[in-house]
A protein has these predicted regions:
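Carbohydrate-associated surface elements
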Residues: 27, 127, 148
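Conserved donor-binding/catalytic core segment of Leloir-type glycosyltransferases
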Residues: 166-184, 190-193, 206
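N-terminal strand-loop element at the rim of the active site
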Residues: 1, 6-52
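Short His-centered aromatic/hydrophobic patch
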Residues: 74-80
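A short, histidine- and acid-enriched strand-loop-helix "catalytic/donor-clamping" loop
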Residues: 51, 80-82, 91-106, 117-120
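Acidic anion/phosphate-binding donor-loop and adjacent secondary structure
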Residues: 102-105, 133, 148-165
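A short beta-strand/loop micro-motif in the catalytic core of glycosyltransferases
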Residues: 73-74, 117-125
Length: 208
C-alpha cells in the first residue's frame, strides 16, 4: 500500500468511530481477511483499470441515490470524484504528483473543474497546497493535513538495539519513508551520498 491508501485507511478507521462509513476500494486478492477485520463496510471493485473508474463511479452514485441520509463523500483523487453526481458535501485529497499538469492543458482544466467545485480540498503538504494554487485551484478551499501514523504500542527490543547501534555517533541522518519503488528515486539519493559524504562525513542514510 502507498501513502494515500494508508491515509484513506486512517481516515476511514477514525471516522468510523463517529459515523457509519462505506468504502469503495480496488480489488485485492487478499482483501477478505482485511475487510472482515475493520470497523467499516468495504465494497471492492475489480476489472480493467480503464473501466474500473466508471464502474466505481456508477456504484457510488447508486449507493448515494439509495441512501438519502449520507452526509458527504471523501475521495482520494480528483479522478475518483470527477463522475460523482451529488449535492452532498464533497471532500477531495490531493497529492502533488496527481495535480501537476501544465496550466492551460486539458488535464489541468479537468483538475480545476473538479477541485474548484468540491467543498473542501485536503492537501498532504504545504508544498502541494502552494502548487495547487499556482495551477489555478481556489486557495481558500485548501487545508493542509499532513499524513499521520498509528502510535506503536510496543517496540521490539531487538529492533531498538539495532537502530541504536546503527545511529550511534551519527549526528547527520538522512531518512526516506516510502515504498521501494523505482519512481520514488531512491537511487538518486544514493548517488548524491558521495557528495554529501564529503560535507557530512558521519552521514547515515536510512530507508524505511
Amino acid at each position: 500500500l502507498g501513502g494515500m491508501q494508508n491515509l484513506m485507511w486512517g481516515l476511514s478507521n477514525s471516522l468510523s468511530k463517529h459515523f457509519m462509513i462505506k468504502v469503495f476500494a480496488d480489488f485485492h486478492k487478499d482483501h477478505k481477511n482485511y475487510d472482515n477485520s475493520v470497523s467499516f463496510s468495504v465494497e471492492r471493485i475489480g476489472g480493467f483499470k480503464l473501466f474500473k473508474k466508471y464502474r466505481k463511479a456508477y456504484l457510488v452514485n447508486e449507493f448515494i441515490k439509495k441512501n438519502k441520509n449520507i452526509e458527504g463523500v471523501i475521495a482520494d483523487h480528483w479522478k475518483s470524484i470527477e463522475l460523482i453526481k451529488t449535492n452532498k458535501k464533497k471532500i477531495c485529497l490531493i497529492h502533488s504528483k496527481e495535480i501537476n499538469h501544465d496550466k492551460g492543458t486539458n488535464l489541468n482544466k479537468r483538475v480545476l473543474k473538479v477541485l474548484n467545485n468540491v467543498d473542501h480540498i485536503v492537501s498532504n503538504s504545504k508544498y502541494t497546497k502552494d502548487l495547487a494554487i499556482t495551477l489555478g485551484v481556489i486557495s481558500n478551499k485548501i487545508s493542509v493535513i499532513n499524513p499521520g501514523i498509528d502510535p506503536v504500542k510496543n517496540l521490539d527490543e531487538t529492533s531498538l538495539k539495532d537502530a541504536e547501534k546503527l545511529l550511534k555517533g551519527k549526528k547527520t541522518r538522512l531518512i526516506t519513508v516510502s515504498r521501494y519503488d523505482k519512481r520514488k528515486n531512491h537511487e538518486k539519493v544514493i548517488m548524491a551520498l558521495r557528495n554529501l559524504k564529503q560535507i557530512y562525513p558521519d552521514i547515515v542514510y536510512i530507508c524505511v
